[in-house]
Structures are given as C-alpha cells and as structure tokens.
Amino acid sequence: MKKICSTLLVLCLLLTASSLAFADQSQKKAVYELYSVDGFYEDEVGNAEAYSFHVPQIFDDTPDAEAINSEIAERFGNRVEEQFLNMEGGYSLWSWHAEWKAFWNGTQLFLLITADENGGFKDYGAYGYDFETGSRITNEMILEQKGISEEEYLENLREKVQFMFEDMYSSLSEEIREAAGYDEMLEKTLGWLDMEQPMFIDQLGGIETIVKIASVAGAEWYYYLATPFSYG
C-alpha cells in the first residue's frame, strides 16, 4: 500500500512539473519581438551612447491581439523607426531605450512597455490580453476580477497620486511653490485621473496604473506608475 501511494505521489509530482513546464513554454511563445536591436551610436556632433530597442507583440490570431499589436507598433515601433532614420542621417537620437515586461495571471497576459526620451521623459504603455478568451482585458474587467468598485479604485488612486505629488515636491520652499502654482498643479494632476488611465496587474497581483503628474519644470507633465492596490 505504501509503495502504491509513493508511486502515485511521484506520478502527481511528475504531472505537476510537466504541466508547469508546458505552461512556462507556452508563456515564452506567447510574446515575440517586433524589434530586438542593441548597439552603440555616435551622432555627427559627438553624442555617443548605447541604445536598446525591444518592442513586443502578442502571438495569437484574434482581432483583439491584432488590434493591440497594431497599437504597440504605431506607438513604440514608429518611435524606433525614427531613431533608425536619425542614425542613417547621422542625426541625434531623441530616444535610446525601449523595453517591456510581461506579467502573467493565469491565461491573462499584461504587457508593460517603457521607452525613454531625452530630458528624462518616460513613455509607458500597458496592454492586457486573455489567451483563453482571445480578448483584450479592459480596466473594468480588472476591477471586477479584483472585486473593486470604480469609486473605491479612483479614491485610492487619488490618495496615492496626491501622496506621490506631495512627496515629489516636498523639498520646495513656499516661495517656489507659490511661483510654480503648486496648488493648481496638484489640482490639475488629480483632475487627470479617471477610468481611462491604463492599468495592469503586476507580478504580485496588485493593480498598477500609468498616471500623469504635473511638473514644475521641463514638460507640463511626466508619466509615472502608481499602485493604488498593492495586494493580490
């Protein structure tokens, strides 16, 4: 009897390991790269730096996967193409890096794409896709899955972003705050928050959101990642 139980246990472990290995291989094949280029470039005025461009695509034959891939190619692929054209002409690059991360939640894939620009600006893109249903994952679906209402989500998001804003500019003197329009900037930042901000489920099962925070210098605003719900 003990021998039978031991044999069954071994079989279960082997099946589990095989299943996990299959799932891991399936996940690896689920995403491919439209661009995968690394190198070093020096322009005609002597600006030199390493560049790295990696832009993902979803490997699935559905209308939603095709739509997401087109959006990614238009937003991030075109950016890379512009840098290639600049290299051909010996001109300066305005973007040097584009990278992506994949977060899995069962059959759900969430892609986070980050691309930098000169001046410290970062562009973010978040996309969700369910391989089981072959459909795009919307913000509303994420909240429903987590059992969170839109009101609760927006309240937490505003609290988180306000904390980020205040922490970001905590070192500014009252004089500089007044000159920069600190209160107006905070009001503007919170006013940008709605259900349209891209969100995704991260590796810990928390919800992360791409938000805009008003800036006292440089661009009017910059993108940041906010985590209104960090639990799984």
Question: Which residue ranges define each predicted feature?
Answer:
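Sec-dependent N-terminal signal peptides of Gram-positive bacterial secreted proteins and lipoproteins
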Residues: 4-23
